């Protein structure tokens, strides 16, 4: 019993110790670190297509634990996860068997231990070469023109793949046909190749190319099985009948034959050509025939083409036909004849063999002999040929153009204007020869000077458009192929009327007194007679005088003028060349009728206005001058004489200065004012200003009595050079008479 309690106590003690140990271990966590990580590529980073590739990830981890921690190893290609494994080992491997181009790329290894991780650098792997493609054909025997389907694939590679397929003839170097195609989504292509007529035994070759980054990897060229080609028909053959020498007049037969195999589904088309022209063809049998009577025109190269769908075979032969007689020659005594002359035609054959002759004009027979003679008319113009025959052979000669020219009739000349011709107006002058062979050459002349030329291809009139500016005489000449000299028409006289141009009104005297005459002249620069003149007073619709005369000027006068004739006047001029809306109007003139008293008053007013204007101008000038200098000098004395440019006079001179305005000389009363700068003083003269007290007489006193009223006057004194006379200009404030 005691022993049982002892054993039970020991068990509890062991359990207690275990708990204590575990709690102690839990209180102390293990520490770890990833010292390094490295990746190896075996056998090396550049491998041939089909080899095995091993990626090794080497990890060095340090820890305080007696047991190596469990870490996670990840393999990446181009940042895409390839393999993931949890391990306690230092080295983990990943095998890629039979690498292909698609396995080229950048590889790296990543290690994760709890919350710590480390990654290796990226390693470039390059797979060289492409696996051999597979070439398959849909048939091993084919007829000419048939189609062979070629399939080329690289099953172990990934798209896109660029395929090149070539067709070769057995025992012949160089490809007969080459085709290329890129398959974007599949690792194979299927292409059709047509079998041509020259193919006998053919094979196909395929090569694959894949783009890997900046590199292009290519496979070995792989050849297909041999394909046997059967003919659908033979090459064409020619048969010429008669054999040997072929003479003109013989029956010529050109035959082309071909042999068709039993594998052909239908007959091919047989075509016979002579110098590109198809002369015979057949698609219902194995031959085509061209039959004709032989002439020298059938000499040449003949070609036979046999065509069926995609197949075409060609054969050629040269046919020589011996000439029986030469081509006839047609000769004429002349090719251009005047009407009434004799035409002589002669047809001959070199060597002069016996033959039958026919002379034709435009397809109609005019003679059945070698010679043809006739006195010609215009209707005999045309094309002449000669036909010579020996047996069944007929030959046509050269063509001769005969032109018979009819003499022209005297041309007539006329124009279309039914009324008078106005200067500058366009008129149509026509010239026509009713009889004569065309073309006819017309020339329009003006007093022996050519104006225009025109050729007409018929007997219709030639129309010339002219613009005469004065009376003119026209004549036209006509000429054609006839040997006669030119024919001249009569003279056509064209009368041209000129419209009135620029009217002008002139008055003999624009200002008249009552009882004096008023005389108007209305004239024009140019215009055909008669001219109608009309005189108008302004604002009146009807003329007060009009007349039609044969002159470029007209006068109207009124012997005694009165006040009612005062106003504005104008005139108009027109002739039959002026349209109603284009009447020429002159300038406008004003006529004034004055009484003698009015005339004197007007003169006085005009003179007064001139004097006032000059006084105001001088006053403004001196005021501006005084303000500009601003150098007033004051002085006073009883009376100072005023000086002008010519004389010195006192302001108190009776009868001479009392009624005179200042700033003018004595000649003002004679309507002549002397300019202030008469002595042409230089602009640099010194100027002095003096204040002067002037005594003026009382208004009610006479000019000889001295008044007691004084005025202040500013005097400007200029100092001149010794060579000049001293000029003094005086101005007073107000007038001398107190007004």
Swiss-Prot record:
Q: Which Pfam families match?
A: Ig_2, Ig_C17orf99
Name the SMART domains for this protein.
Answer: IG (SM00409)
> What residue intervals hold the motif ITIM motif 2?
712-717
- Alphabetized PROSITE patterns for the sequence: IG_LIKE
What's noted about domains in the record?
The Ig-like C2-type domains 2 and 3 contribute to formation of the complex with BDKRB2 and in regulation of its activity.
**Record keywords, A-Z:** Cell adhesion, Cell junction, Cell membrane, Disulfide bond, Glycoprotein, Immunoglobulin domain, Lipoprotein, Membrane, Palmitate, Phosphoprotein, Repeat, Signal, Transmembrane, Transmembrane helix
Query: What modifications follow translation?
Result: Phosphorylated on Ser and Tyr residues by src kinases after cellular activation. Upon activation, phosphorylated on Ser-730 which probably initiates the dissociation of the membrane-interaction segment (residues 708-730) from the cell membrane allowing the sequential phosphorylation of Tyr-714 and Tyr-689. Constitutively phosphorylated on Ser-735 in resting platelets. Phosphorylated on tyrosine residues by FER and FES in response to FCER1 activation. In endothelial cells Fyn mediates mechanical-force (stretch or pull) induced tyrosine phosphorylation.
Q: Which organism is it from?
A: Bos taurus
Protein name, entry field: Platelet endothelial cell adhesion molecule
Which residues point to the Extracellular side?
Answer: 28-599
- Annotated region (May play a role in cytoprotective signaling) at 722-739
Its principal location?
Answer: membrane
Membrane topology for this entry? Single-pass type I membrane protein
> Which chain regions cross the lipid bilayer?
600-618
* Gene Ontology biological process terms in this record: cell surface receptor signaling pathway; cell-cell adhesion via plasma-membrane adhesion molecules; cellular response to mechanical stimulus; immune response; positive regulation of MAPK cascade
In this record, residues modified by a lipid of the kind S-palmitoyl cysteine are: 620
**Cysteines engaged in disulfide bonds, as pairs:** 57-109, 152-206, 256-304, 347-386, 431-476, 522-571
Modified positions (Phosphotyrosine) are: 689, 714
Whether Transmembrane counts among this entry's keywords is yes
Instruction: Tell me a GO cellular component.
Output: plasma membrane
- Database matches in Gene3D superfamilies: Immunoglobulins
Region: Membrane-bound segment which detaches upon phosphorylation, residue numbers: 708-730
- Cytoplasmic topology ranges: 619-739
């Amino acid at each position: 019993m005691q022993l049982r309690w002892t054993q039970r106590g020991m068990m509890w003690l062991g359990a207690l110790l275990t708990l204590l140990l575990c709690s102690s271990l839990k209180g102390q966590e293990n520490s770890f670190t990833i010292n390094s990580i490295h990746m190896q590529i075996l056998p090396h980073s550049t491998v041939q297509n089909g080899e095995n590739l091993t990626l090794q990830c080497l990890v060095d981890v340090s820890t305080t634990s007696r047991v190596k921690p469990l870490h996670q190893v990840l393999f990446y290609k181009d940042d895409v996860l390839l393999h993931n494994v949890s391990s306690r080992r230092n080295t983990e491997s990943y095998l890629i068997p039979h690498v292909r181009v698609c396995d080229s790329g950048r590889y790296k290894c990543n290690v994760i231990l709890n919350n710590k991780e480390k990654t290796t650098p990226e390693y470039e792997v390059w797979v060289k070469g492409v696996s051999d493609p597979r070439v398959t054909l849909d048939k091993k025997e084919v007829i000419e023109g048939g189609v062979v389907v070629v399939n080329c694939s690289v099953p172990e590679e990934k798209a896109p793949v660029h395929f090149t397929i070539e067709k070769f003839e057995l025992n012949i170097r160089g490809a007969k046909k080459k085709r290329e195609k890129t398959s974007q989504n599949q690792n194979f292509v299927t292409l059709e190749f047509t079998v041509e007529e020259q193919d006998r035994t053919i094979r196909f070759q395929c090569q694959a190319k894949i783009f890997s980054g900046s590199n292009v990897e290519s496979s070995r060229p792989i050849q297909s099985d041999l394909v046997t080609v059967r003919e659908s028909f033979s090459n064409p053959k020619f048969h010429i009948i008669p054999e040997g020498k072929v003479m003109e007049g013989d029956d010529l037969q050109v035959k082309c034959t071909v042999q068709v195999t039993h594998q052909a589904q239908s007959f091919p088309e047989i075509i016979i050509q002579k110098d590109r022209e198809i002369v015979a063809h057949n698609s219902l049998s194995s031959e085509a025939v061209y039959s004709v009577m032989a002439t020298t025109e059938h000499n040449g190269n003949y070609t036979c083409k046999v065509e069926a769908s995609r197949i075409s075979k060609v054969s050629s032969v040269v046919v020589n036909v011996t000439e029986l007689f030469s081509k006839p020659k047609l000769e004429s005594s002349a090719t251009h004849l005047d009407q009434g002359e004799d035409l002589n035609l002669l047809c001959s054959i070199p060597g002069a063999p016996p033959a039958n002759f026919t002379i034709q004009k435009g397809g109609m027979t005019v003679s059945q002999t070698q010679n043809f003679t006739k006195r010609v008319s215009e209707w005999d113009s045309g094309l002449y040929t000669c036909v010579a025959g020996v047996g069944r052979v007929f030959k046509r000669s050269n063509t001769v153009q005969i032109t018979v020219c009819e003499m022209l009739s005297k041309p007539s000349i006329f124009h279309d204007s039914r009324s008078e011709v106005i200067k500058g107006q366009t008129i149509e002058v026509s010239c026509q020869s009713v009889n004569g062979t065309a073309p006819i050459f017309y020339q329009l002349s003006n007093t022996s000077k050519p104006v225009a030329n025109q050729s007409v291809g018929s007997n219709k009139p030639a129309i010339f458009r002219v613009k005469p500016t004065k009376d003119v005489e026209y004549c036209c000449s006509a000429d054609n192929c006839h040997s006669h000299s030119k024919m001249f028409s009569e003279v056509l006289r064209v009368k041209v009327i000129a419209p009135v141009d620029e009217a002008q009104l002139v008055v003999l005297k624009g200002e008249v007194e009552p009882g004096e005459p008023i005389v108007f002249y209305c004239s024009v620069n140019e215009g055909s007679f008669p001219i109608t003149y009309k005189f108008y007073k302004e604002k009146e619709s009807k003329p007060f005088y009009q007349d039609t005369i044969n002159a470029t000027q007209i006068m109207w006068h009124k012997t005694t003028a009165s006040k009612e004739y005062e106003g504005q006047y104008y005139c108009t001029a027109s002739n039959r060349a002026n349209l109603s809306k284009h009447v020429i109007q002159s300038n406008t003139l004003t006529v004034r009728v004055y009484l003698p008293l009015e005339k004197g008053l007007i003169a006085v007013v005009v003179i007064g206005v001139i004097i006032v204007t000059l006084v105001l101008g001088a006053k403004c000038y001196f005021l501006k001058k005084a303000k500009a200098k601003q150098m007033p000098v004051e002085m006073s004395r009883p009376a100072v004489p005023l000086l002008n440019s010519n004389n010195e006079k006192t302001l108190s001179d009776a009868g001479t200065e009392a009624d005179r305005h200042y700033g003018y000389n004595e000649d003002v009363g004679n309507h002549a004012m002397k300019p202030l700068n008469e002595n042409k003083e230089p602009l640099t003269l010194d100027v002095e200003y003096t204040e002067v007290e002037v005594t003026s007489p009382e208004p009610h006193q006479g000019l000889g009595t001295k008044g007691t009223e004084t005025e202040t006057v500013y005097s400007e004194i200029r100092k001149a050079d010794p060579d000049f006379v001293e000029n003094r200009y005086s101005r007073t404030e107000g007038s001398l008479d107190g007004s």
